């Protein structure tokens, strides 16, 4: 399954440590394409593992993670406006 993950981590109450940990977890599973944005192919099992790891760090009252899912990245067309640093083809 093709996924796009975006997160918003608050700087309050030790947010920098949380941000660093969330970034490292996401990097294990997905390709970093922009600040707080990752994309890639994951199985349902990998999505569950990612969710479990992130939930150990995400502070539900301060932080958020959004996961967009698609059966296949062919259903999305990526358009880059401005600086284009990555080598991926498809995006919402």
Regions found by a protein language model. Name each.
Residues 1-37, 41, 45-46:
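Extended, hydrophobic alpha-helical segments
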Residues 4, 26, 50, 85-92:
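Unusually extended, aromatic-enriched hydrophobic runs near protein termini
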Residues 24-25, 51-56, 77-78:
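Intrinsically disordered, low-complexity boundary segments flanking structured domains
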Residues 34-64, 69-71:
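Short, intrinsically disordered low-complexity segments
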Residues 57-92:
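C-terminal structural segments of small proteins and small subunits
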């Amino acid at each position: 399954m093709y996924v796009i993950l975006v997160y918003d981590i608050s700087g309050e109450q030790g947010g920098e440590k949380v941000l660093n940990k969330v970034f490292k977890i996401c990097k294990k599973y997905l390709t970093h394409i922009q600040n707080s944005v990752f994309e890639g192919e994951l199985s349902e099992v990998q999505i569950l593992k990612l969710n479990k790891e992130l939930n150990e760090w995400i502070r539900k009252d301060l932080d958020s993670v959004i996961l967009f899912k698609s059966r296949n990245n062919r259903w999305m067309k990526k358009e880059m406006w401005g600086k284009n640093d990555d080598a991926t083809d498809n995006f919402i």
